[in-house]
């Protein structure tokens, strides 16, 4: 299969997923769009800008936008080998530290300011599987009040191929502890796939199920997500 044909096929899949997600909005399944633009400054530092429809932890429809900066360790040979076809080269690092700011806005609600601090560990396994352990703390200021939450996302993924094209299916689980409820109030489960297109574009198409117990009655939420990741670099190869 020629690479040009693969690219056309992927764009077609992305279009189908987009329209499927739009039709799902009228049903119980909701659509979560996202776009991230990443710029690698050197071998150990990357910045990115993120814009997404954020309904994490049972939040209402809201727009989250803001920048982040990431700091890497040097890549490990084993990790670099099993993530060769993933455009996100942070996965080849055993530890990635990150901090960022997000402006959170929602219709009819006061704006929210969020600071994010994240530490992600990557572990290579046998049979070319990769485990990612992301530990994230959100510090939220809204209308004079303050809340925080801790999120621990564990992801298992493995690159597969059809002819010469490689894609990356994954599953993940993420529990949340939220200070406003003083308990582990949310559990999110994910199943998705990463589709690289060329050297700079990667799509993430996924299904997410959330169980929220912070408010009564408990809420079950289902989402289909479509994320566009752009990767650029100023670092010399």
Where are these regions (language model features)?
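Residues that define the transmembrane beta-barrel architecture of outer-membrane proteins
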Residues: 29-31, 61-65, 111-115, 146-152, ...
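Outer-membrane beta-barrel initiation region
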Residues: 26-42, 235-237
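Bacterial Sec-dependent N-terminal signal peptides
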Residues: 1-31
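Outer-membrane beta-barrel transmembrane domain signature
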Residues: 73-77, 123-215, 224, 229-237
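Transmembrane beta-strand segments that form the barrel wall of outer-membrane beta-barrel proteins
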Residues: 33, 44-56, 80-86, 93-107, ...
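Acidic-and-aromatic substrate-binding clefts and catalytic sites of carbohydrate-active enzymes
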Residues: 27-28, 54-61, 106-110, 182-183
């Amino acid at each position: 299969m020629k690479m040009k044909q693969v690219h056309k096929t992927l764009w077609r899949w992305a279009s189908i997923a987009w329209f499927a997600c739009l039709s799902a909005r009228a049903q119980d399944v909701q659509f979560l769009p996202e776009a991230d633009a990443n710029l690698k400054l050197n071998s150990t530092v990357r910045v990115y800008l993120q814009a997404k429809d954020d309904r994490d932890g049972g939040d209402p429809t809201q727009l989250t936008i803001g920048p982040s900066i990431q700091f890497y360790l040097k890549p490990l040979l084993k990790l670099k080998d099993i993530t060769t076809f993933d455009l996100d080269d942070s996965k080849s690092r055993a530890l990635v530290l990150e901090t960022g700011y997000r402006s959170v806005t929602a219709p009819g609600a006061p704006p929210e300011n969020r600071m994010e601090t994240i530490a992600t560990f990557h572990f290579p396994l046998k049979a070319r599987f990769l485990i990612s352990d992301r530990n994230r703390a959100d510090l939220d200021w809204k209308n004079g009040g303050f809340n925080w939450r801790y999120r621990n996302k564990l992801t298992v993924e493995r690159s597969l191929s059809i002819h010469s094209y490689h894609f990356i299916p994954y599953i993940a689980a993420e529990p949340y502890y939220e200070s406003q409820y003083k308990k582990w109030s949310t559990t999110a489960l994910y199943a998705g796939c990463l589709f690289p297109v060329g050297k700079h574009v990667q799509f993430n198409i996924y299904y997410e199920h959330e169980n929220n117990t912070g408010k009564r009655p408990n809420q079950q939420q289902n989402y289909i997500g479509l994320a566009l990741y752009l990767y650029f670099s100023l670092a010399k190869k």
